[in-house]
């Protein structure tokens, strides 16, 4: 923000907005804690998207509001908008088809299957950094074009749903038949802080494709959605871009066919914009002056809009009918020979040297130009595997249409989780493997059935530790980002989850529970696994002198192996699970940061994380049966001993390994080793925020509160994937 232009005309009034010396007195100004301690634990990540930031209040029900929507009228308004060209941002060829497709694509395209974060599900394109990414130039205009429609329909349609629906309507208006549309994306009201966009400090910093396979990053350069369209690091080489394309689309869960279909389909309509050098382009929306009102990238070149627009710096039109669906992308790709050239802005692109002028100008009907392509478009011709698929689509346009329809639906719905979350009249009936489909329920256990099942579990010989551990193993795969994982489906009993090291308890416990399920035939295995946790916790609470009934909602089903994509479910295997004192790799962040990461995926607050760790430690749920963090002389009792002993100054802690991952607590007087611990344990005494929470549960009057809080947090985790209850 410019202090000369944006301080309420202070120069004209003669008043300075600050005291002499220029000190900023506003809240949050000045040197912050993270400036002093940049490695400070990000406990604040667990405070995101609370009711304090939500203007609609905790009683707002989006599904209920959506049911009041005149869906046909909304689509009609979107269709009319496509050709309602506005002078402040004129439409290419009189149509916003390409712009809205790009908006939807770039909203959904931030999704990464490796950690489930990103994607279009929360409408994050409204906020920084995405609203100001170099790859999202001019999408601020697309969102402003949509505002009158959003204003008209209000809370009956979320921004997140509207962005994707606008892209769908644009495709349909071009003559393309989409696969369907599922609404249900709920808006949030602040930027996601948990998404790791990378460590780079400068936009468009290049990353090697191999690095993408090791980190949850979706693009080859900071600030891009996928790959650099000029080739890796502006190389201009189509073949060298193949690895980058596979890495980025692969991180979204796309195979080669889906990748080719998405690139070609996305480039069948619309154009890129590079009328002049980027030096004409002003600040992005987040850095623009206050009078810009959230719009950015104002251009000083000519009119700055229409034929003078600068977006990517590339000036490419792929097809002869850029507002109507066709197979011209593949026809042009293989029909002509391509030579490297540069756009008016100086960006590397390719032109069909032997083609006539067959491409219409977007604003002057009397003008034509030669077909042009991006460097990465030609990758689909020159990479051997991509070329096979591209030629098949060239010769079979219907196969291309079907592949793109399905890939587009996957792109725009991948982060929504199971189909149970979809709402609206255009939800496809077909179940797709990437939706983690579930069968219809076979059981409807009565209250009497549940009582009998609990008795059978209690009499099975399983320990409290085993019962609680197996329930946690089943439910804790849930990821709040893409709503995958969780206890529903009992996929703990299927590959790959049953073979994960962290789930070693399953080999001992599942046969017992499977026998109970088979013998009683009253409930699904998924329900029985969760019910085992209920039995274990109730027994542990009773042993602590607290009688409590753990809430249990039956209705889970058992997935089949053929409904489970092993490769995609393998991505849910935790690198670390601090709740079970599990850490598979030491080369990825710190143990305590990974604990925060896991808690954030489980949508837990800091108090919920704290009470769960403390309770699970005294119940002996470490994945390997170790005594690390088991700060109690009475394991299996749901006590506050973890907190009381951790904060007890009688004990002094010292590391026992070179990596500072393992510790022992010795009596300060005798030197005797009393307890052992990991970083996931000691962080509740070392971090000031977590220590403050631990102190609550370490107090002498906290026991009953602790049990109640533990049960509430536990039930929350068990029901995270019960979208039928939400």
From Swiss-Prot:
GO CC annotation, single: cytosol
GO molecular function: catalase activity; heme binding; metal ion binding
Catalytic activity: H2O2 + AH2 = A + 2 H2O; 2 H2O2 = O2 + 2 H2O
InterPro entries named among the record's database cross-references: Catalase_peroxidase, Haem_peroxidase, Haem_peroxidase_sf, Peroxidases_AS, Peroxidases_heam-ligand_BS
Cross-linked sites for Tryptophyl-tyrosyl-methioninium (Trp-Tyr) (with M-252): 105-226
Keywords from the named record: Heme, Hydrogen peroxide, Iron, Metal-binding, Oxidoreductase, Peroxidase
Any one of the GO BP annotations: cellular response to hydrogen peroxide
Residues annotated for heme b binding in this entry: 267
Description of how the protein assembles with itself and partners: Homotetramer.
Protein name per its UniProtKB record: Catalase-peroxidase
